[in-house]
Every structure is written in structure tokens, then in C-alpha cells.
Amino acid sequence: WVWKGDEEIDIPREEKDTTRFMPIDKPEKSPYGYAEEQIKMLNGIKLHEAGFKGEGMRVAVVDAGFMNVDRISVFDSLRLLGTHNVVFPGRSVFIGDDHGTKVLSCLAADAPGLMVGTAPQAEYWLIKSEDSRSEFPIEEDYWTAAMEFADSVGVDVVSSSLGYFSFDVDALNY
């Protein structure tokens, strides 16, 4: 089975439309903000204190999309090397699905008092390999292409929280 759907629809955004990103209260006490519990579980604070914040590392985040990463303030200091859309070549990875945005925030956010990720000083490639409109085996090929692209641009680490075992057609499940 190979599935090919309609191309993604780009919905134009007005540059001045920031109403969806209202200021939120900063949590008190910790420079890690909302990420404090998460980074404590990984002993990340000790790593940061020892100077390990991702500097010199190239990380590829392979996911379903990175909606509004280019507009969210916790990513203002993001060291973005580039983006690549395997599903819709040439299209922006910053529209559509936001799962990759959430994953990236755990890694790259750098807004002390609000949220600091585990590797805020790393350099990042954002790669879209998931077509979130449906689930078909072709997405495994997209994922493989994303891994090959990440390797070709010299990344050190890949973060991918995608998995495939259940599809829209039951006969394709494993």
C-alpha cells in the first residue's frame, strides 16, 4: 500500500497576529521554570552546573511539525541550523502540527524563570516526517528519509518520538 493524499493547505498568517501568544505568569523560585521537575528527573541541573548545556552538539528533532516555533519567545535564542520537510518538500515546518514544538521546548527552550530545556546551547535541525492527517506505512519511509537527511547534515543526536505499528487500515497493522 502506498497512500498519497491532498497536499497540505497553507493558511496565510498575518505577521501582526500575536493574539494566540499571550504573556503567562512566570513561576517563582527556579530559573528552570515550568521545566524544573522534568530536568530534575534527568539530573539535568547537575549537568548544567557542570557546564553541559548542549554546546557543540548538533541535534535533529524529527517530528510531525513545529507549529509557530518561529514566533514563540522561548525559542528566541534557538540555534537553528535549518529545517527540512520530508512530507511536503519546500513547505514550512512551522505550520500544522505542534507535537515537535512541544518536544523542542523540552530540549531547546531558553527563557530563564519560564522554561529552560536540557540542551539550550545545542544547534538544531527541525525535520518534519509525519503526515498527521492519517496513518499509513509510507510514513515509515518518510521517517527513514528524515534519518538519512539528518545524517547527511552531520547531526550528533536525533530526537524522534514517533512510532508506527497501528495504521488506518487494520490489515497493515503489526
Which ranges hold each PLM region?
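Conserved residues at the C-terminal ends of beta-strands
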Residues: 3-5, 130, 161
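Subtilisin-like serine protease catalytic core
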Residues: 35, 45-140, 153-156, 167-169
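Short acidic, glycine-rich surface-loop motifs adjacent to enzyme active sites
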Residues: 148-174
